[in-house]
Curated annotation (Swiss-Prot):
It is found in: Cytoplasm. This is Translation initiation factor IF-1. Residues 1-72 form the S1-like domain. The keyword Protein biosynthesis applies. One of the essential components for the initiation of protein synthesis. Stabilizes the binding of IF-2 and IF-3 on the 30S subunit to which N-formylmethionyl-tRNA(fMet) subsequently binds. Helps modulate mRNA selection, yielding the 30S pre-initiation complex (PIC). Upon addition of the 50S ribosomal subunit IF-1, IF-2 and IF-3 are released leaving the mature 70S translation initiation complex. It holds the Pfam family eIF-1a. Component of the 30S ribosomal translation pre-initiation complex which assembles on the 30S ribosome in the order IF-2 and IF-3, IF-1 and N-formylmethionyl-tRNA(fMet); mRNA recruitment can occur at any time during PIC assembly. It comes from Francisella tularensis subsp. novicida (strain U112). InterPro entries: NA-bd_OB-fold, RNA-binding_domain_S1_IF1, S1_domain, TIF_IF1.
Length: 72
């Protein structure tokens, strides 16, 4: 699957789950479970409850995603 197929949406982190997973509420009201992308993990970027994030979602499974960016 190419990167162009992914859907990017903004959301807010609701809670932190084990194994660097997060529950994120998207701007359209849907709640997804997301994990941190590899570059964020490598650079030790911390994500806390209430942070605004950009989530990549595949069209195949709209309940899971990858946190790509954390805005201030």
């Amino acid at each position: 699957m190419a990167k162009e197929d992914c859907i990017e949406m903004e959301g807010v982190v609701l809670e932190a789950l084990p194994n660097t997973m997060f529950r994120v509420e998207l701007e359209n009201g849907h709640i997804v479970t997301a994990h941190i992308s590899g570059k964020m993990r490598k650079n030790y970027i911390r994500i806390l409850t209430g942070d605004k994030v950009v989530v990549e979602i595949t069209p195949y499974d709209l309940t899971k995603g990858r946190i790509k960016f954390r805005s201030k």
